[in-house]
């Protein structure tokens, strides 16, 4: 179960919700998870306990909600899944070896990386005009100094272009940024991409 890197996964709620209906999705990038590469469900006898992250709940609800289901109970199911599948593996690291540390550190990374404000400062905002994938990638490399992984949903019938879905930043085992390896699942094609604005 040895893993080599962590992947900080941000997703864009409008794209997630385009696939399914959501009520009032956040209009900012939220956390999908902090995932060790190449492993899952490392310890089935370490159940998720919401009491351990009580102090983190206000931030969890804001930055790590279950975008598809707005009820708070659903977010607990989502966090349980993330802990059982990914957190139990991440816990190999001292910095992440409890539920409080795993969720707390992920929130810290989210705030430090500040993807939302970074994209805005770069002038990359949700728009009905399209962006070029290469422009988004190069802009992010300029800020973070590493190559991110940008993931898209392919165009559905009637759509002209792919839709921006997730942005991943990769970290070493000592939580330093590193290049994300190419390629991967659902990676974006070169060319135009739609970064969907919130529905009115």
Curated annotation (Swiss-Prot):
Entry EC no(s): 4.6.1.19
Pfam families reported in the protein's UniProt record: Ribonuclease_T2 (PF00445)
CDD domains: RNase_T2_euk
Catalytic residues (UniProt): 32, 82, 86
Glycosylation sites recorded in the entry for this protein: 43, 73, 116
GO molecular function, one term: RNA binding
Disulfide bonds: 17-22, 42-89, 152-188, 170-180
Cellular compartment(s): Secreted; Lysosome lumen; Endoplasmic reticulum lumen; Mitochondrion intermembrane space
Gene Ontology CC: one annotated term: lysosomal lumen
Regulation of protein activity: Inhibited by Zn(2+) and Cu(2+).
Catalytic EC class: lyase
Annotated InterPro entries: Ribonuclease_T2_eukaryotic (IPR033697), RNase_T2-like (IPR001568), RNase_T2-like_sf (IPR036430), RNase_T2_His_AS_1 (IPR018188), RNase_T2_His_AS_2 (IPR033130)
GO biological process: innate immune response; RNA catabolic process
Metal-binding is among the record's keywords: no
Catalytic reaction equation(s): a ribonucleotidyl-ribonucleotide-RNA + H2O = a 3'-end 3'-phospho-ribonucleotide-RNA + a 5'-end dephospho-ribonucleoside-RNA + H(+); an adenylyl-uridine-RNA = a 3'-end 2',3'-cyclophospho-AMP-RNA + a 5'-end dephospho-uridine-RNA; a guanylyl-uridine-RNA = a 3'-end 2',3'-cyclophospho-GMP-RNA + a 5'-end dephospho-uridine-RNA
Alphabetically ordered keywords of this record: Disulfide bond, Endonuclease, Endoplasmic reticulum, Glycoprotein, Hydrolase, Immunity, Innate immunity, Lyase, Lysosome, Mitochondrion, Nuclease, Secreted
Primary location recorded for the protein, binned into one broad class: secreted
Family designation: Belongs to the RNase T2 family.
Role noted for this protein: Ribonuclease that plays an essential role in innate immune response by recognizing and degrading RNAs from microbial pathogens that are subsequently sensed by TLR8. Cleaves preferentially single-stranded RNA molecules between purine and uridine residues, which critically contributes to the supply of catabolic uridine and the generation of purine-2',3'-cyclophosphate-terminated oligoribonucleotides. In turn, RNase T2 degradation products promote the RNA-dependent activation of TLR8.
This protein's name: Ribonuclease T2
Organism, scientific name: Sus scrofa
């Amino acid at each position: 179960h040895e893993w080599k890197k962590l992947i900080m996964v941000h997703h864009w709620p409008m794209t997630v919700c385009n696939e399914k209906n959501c009520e009032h999705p956040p209009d900012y990038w939220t956390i999908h998870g902090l995932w060790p590469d190449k492993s899952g469900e490392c310890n089935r006898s370490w159940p998720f306990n919401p009491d351990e992250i009580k102090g983190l709940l206000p931030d969890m609800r804001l930055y790590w909600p279950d975008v598809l289901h707005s009820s708070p109970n659903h977010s607990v199911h989502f966090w349980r899944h993330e802990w059982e599948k990914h957190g139990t593996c991440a816990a190999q690291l001292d910095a992440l070896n409890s539920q409080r540390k795993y969720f707390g550190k992920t929130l810290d990374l989210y705030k430090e990386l500040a993807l939302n404000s970074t994209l805005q400062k770069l002038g990359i905002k949700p728009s009905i005009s399209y962006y070029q994938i290469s422009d988004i990638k190069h802009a992010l490399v300029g800020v973070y100094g590493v190559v991110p992984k940008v993931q898209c949903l392919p165009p559905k019938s009637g759509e002209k272009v792919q839709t921006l879905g997730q942005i991943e930043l990769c970290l070493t085992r000592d939580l330093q940024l590193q290049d994300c390896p190419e390629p991967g699942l659902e990676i974006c094609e070169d060319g135009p991409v739609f970064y969907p604005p919130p529905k009115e």
